[in-house]
Regions:
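Positively charged n-region of N-terminal signal peptides that target proteins for export
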Residues: 1-5
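WD40-repeat beta-propeller superdomains and closely related acidic/aromatic-rich repeat-like regions
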Residues: 20-319
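Bacterial N-terminal signal peptides
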Residues: 7-17
């Protein structure tokens, strides 16, 4: 199950313990919102931000102008925070009952076939033609956006796929699976390229470097791994933060990774990790993690989306 990482209160000691103000978080722009947004995503290309509110409304902001659009999807149930993806033309969302909706930037909605499973993760290919879906009960799936049909499903020994991404060239799909393996597939036909062994505990998320050569993988072990994308071989590991990591994002410009850390007992946000991969130390940003509702990147580097109030968001650059 993908965890909501921003709606529950935390003790101050949990939030700021081990935080090291070694990096700078600079406000980039403010976004007004007509409803309280609980999850956000930086769209592929970094020009827009999409968000989801508790009435299942889909918000879209242009970062250059701050202009907001609000779309309705008529989905049958709540949208999991991880079941949101967008690029320069399309927003994809999925409900906990398995409904998938595609919304273009003019608000036209098209629904895909019902998956009948809780959707916990989504990612669009760089060209926007393919959608990969992770559910709570099954391996990764790849769907064709134009036809709305599923092209293939992956496989696991047991368990589901927790997180998946498509390579920048659109040729490979990488999945972190509940049976502790990291798997790579040929995006065209779903053929398994490799199943690389992981740690004793399951990985939750994967991010792909801008050149497609390196993966950042993290999960229940509480550390971030760099892996060679061609083989799955571990290249380097960060130190452990002592808590599970549920999301990772690699910078497209410098060797750094952002990580969402949850408290292992409460599964509430416990920190935003920052790893300079030239070292082994996984540090934490000196910010309140319960304000973070999304992370991603643009052409210049890593970005956070934070909730300043129910009516205002802040997009901030991590330097």
């Amino acid at each position: 199950m993908r965890i909501v990482f921003f709606s529950a209160p935390l003790l101050v000691s949990l939030v700021f313990a081990n935080a090291i103000p070694a990096q700078t978080v600079k406000p980039m722009t403010k976004l007004d919102t007509t409803r309280e947004v609980y999850s956000a995503a930086i769209c592929n290309g970094g020009e827009n931000v999409a968000g989801v509110d508790r009435e299942k409304g889909i918000h879209l902001w242009n970062l250059a102008t701050g202009q907001q659009k609000l779309f309705k999807t008529d989905l049958d149930a709540q949208i999991d925070p991880g079941a949101l993806a967008c690029d320069r033309k399309t927003i994809a969302v999925g409900s906990i009952h398995g409904a998938v909706a595609l919304i273009d930037f003019e608000g036209r909605v098209r629904k895909l076939a019902e998956l009948k499973e809780e959707i916990i993760g989504m990612a669009l290919s760089p060209d926007g033609h393919k959608l990969i879906v992770s559910t709570a009960n099954s391996p990764v799936q790849l769907w064709d956006v134009a036809s709305g049909s599923r092209e293939w499903s992956g496989s696991t020994t047991f368990g589901n796929t927790n997180g998946a991404r498509i390579s920048p060239d659109g040729k490979s799909v990488f999945a972190t699976d509940g049976d502790t393996y990291v798997r790579a597939y040929n995006a065209t036909d779903g053929k398994l390229v490799y199943a690389a062994e992981g740690d004793l505990l399951e990985p939750f998320d994967v991010s792909v470097s801008a050149d497609g050569r390196t993966l950042a993988v993290a999960g229940a072990e509480g550390r971030v791994e760099l892996r060679e994308s061609a083989s799955g071989r571990i290249l380097k590991k960060s130190s452990s933060c002592g808590n599970p990591i549920f999301l990772v994002t690699m910078s497209p410009t410098v060797p750094t990774v952002l990580a969402l850390i949850l408290d292992e007992m409460t599964l509430h946000p416990a920190g935003i990790g920052y790893w300079n991969t030239n070292t082994t130390e996984l540090k934490q940003l000196a910010i309140d993690p319960k304000t973070v509702i999304g992370m991603g990147s643009d052409a210049k580097g890593l970005l956070l989306v934070r909730q300043e109030s129910p009516a205002k968001l802040s997009v901030e650059r991590v330097e």
